[in-house]
């Protein structure tokens, strides 16, 4: 209520009273004064009510909408990021200065640029296609021709069996230095070289990439003995099998690597050798399962006790102390092993 509104009501607030001694008696208002008083009060309410109502609504909106605004703020930021990523392919066509951002750029923008440049490997693989080579400029044609060289060197290292990531990374670095870095396609080729060095760490992904580029060449390099009728899926499986079990077959049999790549049957034989469980072996190395060590009878479905490091596999009722021959099948928590010999509690105490 402002001062002007109060002045309008002031004449009606003064009540007429007759002072008789110390007591004051209130005189009731006349109907005319009561009507004027009510009209003035209604006029003031009409002026102040919308303003006070809007103030209350604004305060209520602040209290109720503040938590929702805090929840919606990261959602708005995510939408802005999606819009920026749609524009980023145009930024990739700029010189490779984006790979070295200025100090003024924030960390979030640098992460977006780096992520966008590395993520699409499929777009870079399409550069090798002859259709795009015909549409590109002569400079880009030279750089696109350099890309298959990088990809073709990867199966060469795998064919020799060396697969040294440091040597391959040095070769890729030499090729990337020869390429011009000023053109936009040069930046993509540099990123492509980095992707190839990263793929060398995982042989399976490297194999799949080479298969996409040139399947016939891969079958000639890595699996020379396989016929041309074998489909691409079986070729990939054969390559992975040879790569995985090559070292184990060389150590166990001492045969050269080429002997294991002669035919698919030799690959399956090497797989069967590698898939054998480790506990299987010759009778001299490990005890024959199914025959009791003490009574030399078959164990079959009876409860058995097996101690592999001692060469014991026996019935539960045949298990006994190695000194006093006391049955120890029900006393497994009281056995002691000293110098590869089973002792009961009493025999073990006699040692000290």
Curated annotation (Swiss-Prot):
UniProt keyword Phosphoprotein, yes or no: yes
Polar residues bias spans: 61-72, 251-268
Transmembrane annotation, as ranges: none
GO molecular function: metal ion binding
Keyword Phosphoprotein among UniProt keywords: yes
GO CC term, one of those recorded: cytoskeleton
Superkingdom of source: Eukaryota
Tissue specificity as recorded in UniProt: Expressed in skin, kidney, ovary, testis. Also expressed in brain, cartilage, heart, lung, spleen and thymus.
Major localization class: cytoplasm
Annotated segments matching region Disordered: 1-73, 86-121, 251-287
Annotated function: May be involved in the regulation of cellular proliferation and/or differentiation.
This protein's name: Zinc finger protein 185
Species assigned in the record: Mus musculus
């Amino acid at each position: 209520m402002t001062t002007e509104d109060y002045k309008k009501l002031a004449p009606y607030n003064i009540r007429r009273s007759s002072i008789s001694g110390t007591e004051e008696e209130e005189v009731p208002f006349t109907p005319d004064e009561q009507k004027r008083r009510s009209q003035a009060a209604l006029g003031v309410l009409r002026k102040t009510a919308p303003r006070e109502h809007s103030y209350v609504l604004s305060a209520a909106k602040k209290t109720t909408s503040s938590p929702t605004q805090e929840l919606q703020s990261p959602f708005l930021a995510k939408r802005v990021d999606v819009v920026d990523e749609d524009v980023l392919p145009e930024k990739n066509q700029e010189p490779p200065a984006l790979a070295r951002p200025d100090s003024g750029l924030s960390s979030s923008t640098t992460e977006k640029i780096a992520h966008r440049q590395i993520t699409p490997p499929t777009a870079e693989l399409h550069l090798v296609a002859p259709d795009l080579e015909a549409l590109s400029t002569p400079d880009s044609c030279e750089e696109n021709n350099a890309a298959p060289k990088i990809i073709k060197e990867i199966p060469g290292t795998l064919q020799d069996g060396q697969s040294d990531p440091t040597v391959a990374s040095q070769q890729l670095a030499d090729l990337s230095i020869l390429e011009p870095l000023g053109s936009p396609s040069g930046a993509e080729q540099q990123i492509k070289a980095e992707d190839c060095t990263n793929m060398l760490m995982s042989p399976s992904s490297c194999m799949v990439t080479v298969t996409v580029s040139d399947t016939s060449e891969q079958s000639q390099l890595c699996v020379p003995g396989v016929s041309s009728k074998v489909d691409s899926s079986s070729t990939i499986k054969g390559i992975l099998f040879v790569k995985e079990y090559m070292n184990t077959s060389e150590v166990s049999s001492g045969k050269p690597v080429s002997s294991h790549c002669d035919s698919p049957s030799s690959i399956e034989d090497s797989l069967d050798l590698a898939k054998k469980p480790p506990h299987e072996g010759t009778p001299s190395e490990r005890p024959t399962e199914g025959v009791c060590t003490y009574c030399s009878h078959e164990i079959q479905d009876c409860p058995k006790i097996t101690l592999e490091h001692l060469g014991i596999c026996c019935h539960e009722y045949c298990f006994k102390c190695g000194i006093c021959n006391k049955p120890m099948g029900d006393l497994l928590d009281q056995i002691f092993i000293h110098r590869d010999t089973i002792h009961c509690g009493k025999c073990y105490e006699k040692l000290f």
